[in-house]
Every structure is written in C-alpha cells, then in structure tokens.
Curated annotation (Swiss-Prot):
GO biological process, one term: translation
Gene Ontology molecular function terms on file: large ribosomal subunit rRNA binding; structural constituent of ribosome
One GO CC term on file: cytosolic large ribosomal subunit
UniProt family annotation: Belongs to the universal ribosomal protein uL11 family.
Extent of the signal sequence: none
Protein name according to UniProt: Large ribosomal subunit protein uL11
HAMAP family assigned to the protein according to its UniProt record, in alphabetical order: Ribosomal_uL11 (MF_00736)
Role description: Forms part of the ribosomal stalk which helps the ribosome interact with GTP-bound translation factors.
Length: 144
C-alpha cells in the first residue's frame, strides 16, 4: 500500500533576502500562524540560498497538517534584476515621461534566460518581451 499523502493546510509566499532569513517580521508572523518551526525554516532557507546573497529570493512554503513544511525557491524578481543590470536604485516615478536608465537587448535576454523557468513563456523570445515590458513600465529604455 502506498504511503498516505500529507494534507496541505497552507501555502505561504514570501520574498526574503537570500541567506538572511530570521524570525523577525515578515517571516516569523507568517510562519507562526501556521505553527511551523520558524528557526528550522530559517536555517533551511539560508542554507539553500547562501550562493545567491544580495538578491531577494521569492519562496513558496507548503505547510502540512502535521506542521511539517516544504519550500520551493524561485528566481529573483525581474524588476530587481533589471534594476541591477541598469545600475539604478529604483525605477521612475513617471515611467512613460521620465526615463531613468537604459539596458541593452543582450542584458534583457540574459535576464530572460535566468527567469525562463518562472515565467509564463515557452521560448526565450517571449520571455524577452515580458522582461522588456517590465523594464519599460519601470521607466528603463531597452536599446536594440
């Protein structure tokens, strides 16, 4: 007889600095209300994201009935990758009037290659268009 599947009681989505998860908000309260061992998650997350320090890494935590959990880390948000490629702190307050920076088509393709598993796109061209659109909505011009 196959083992019984664990019943899922919650799905938590967070964006946490890589290698820097701690029990303080937003991590503690989000996990605490589901009864998850917060320190156990923090240690596991920090170990899993150690190589990506400096990035914000989205994570999906699945909580089960017995208070155990599993988590899946995603790729860094496209907006953060675009800002880093453009070398600016934040996007434009008026994206279609005031442009704050420029990125090349090659940089867009590089970001699209990284983000492809998490994007709703089947090929690199479609992913590049999604990334270019995100850049435009942040007031960053795409050249090429």
């Amino acid at each position: 007889m196959p083992p019984k599947k664990k019943k899922v009681t919650g799905l938590i989505k967070l964006q946490i600095q890589a290698g820097a998860a701690n029990p303080a908000p937003p991590v503690g309260p989000a996990l605490g209300q589901h009864g998850v061992n917060i320190m156990e998650f923090c240690k596991a997350y920090n170990a899993a994201t150690e190589s990506q320090r400096g990035w914000v890494i989205p994570v999906e935590i699945t909580v089960y009935e017995d208070r155990s959990f599993t988590f899946i880390t995603k790729t860094p948000p496209a907006a953060k990758m675009i800002l880093k490629a453009a070398g600016v702190e934040k996007g434009s307050g008026e994206p279609h009037k005031t442009k704050v920076a420029k990125i090349t088509q090659a940089q867009v393709r590089e970001i699209a290659t990284t983000k492809l598993p998490d994007l709703n796109a089947n090929d690199l061209d479609a992913a590049s268009k999604i990334i270019a659109g995100t850049a435009r909505s942040m007031g960053i011009t795409v050249e090429g």
